[in-house]
Amino acid sequence: MSNCNIIIVGAGGHGRVCADVARRAGRNVTAFCDPAFSQATEILGIPVLANSERELFDDWPDATELFVAIGDNARRLAIASDACRRGIPLAVLIDPSAVISPSATLGDGVIAMPGVVVNAEAFVGRAALINTSAIVEHGARVGQGAHLGPGACLTGDTAVGARSFVGARATLLPGVHIGDDVSVGARAVVTRDAGDRSRLVGVPARPVRELRLIEPT
């Protein structure tokens, strides 16, 4: 475990949950950075900086890692990637209740929330968010900036593309691959591959456009 301090970008609800995870993992969160909360001096007892990310990055403190706690997948990944280009280290946050296989790989800036399971030889890309009790089974791949909602399940050898979202309790069946910028609705069951920018809902999951085409007139 790193002994570096952490600054969290984003002080909304997600940022506060990330701070809780960091503290349970024994990490020291020295500040939130969020201009939207410029009137707050502290949140959860943690100082709030009203700087923009750019201002913060231009004067980055020593022995400090960054964690980006922004719900928007594209923006979270963009900020994390900008930090990496500037040589700013990204924290990896793993709740003590999460189970991570020693053969799994977690990229920079990933969070594994309470109850998460990441099994053998799974891969989770930079700035991906694995939310409460989500499961990433053996050999599954989670793209950069993706978000698995609470209770989502990626069964064996599945793949989720960059910046994609898998909703609460949704499931990808074994071997299914979905592309970049895909959105899977809550409780959907994805039984076949889906291309970039698909919007999938239902059991079995179908593209929203396809569902509209088969609606009775």
Sequence positions of predicted segments:
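Short alpha-helical
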Residues: G13-R16, A74-R75, T105
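Short amphipathic alpha-helical segments
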Residues: A19-A22, A78-D82, V124, G195-D196, ...
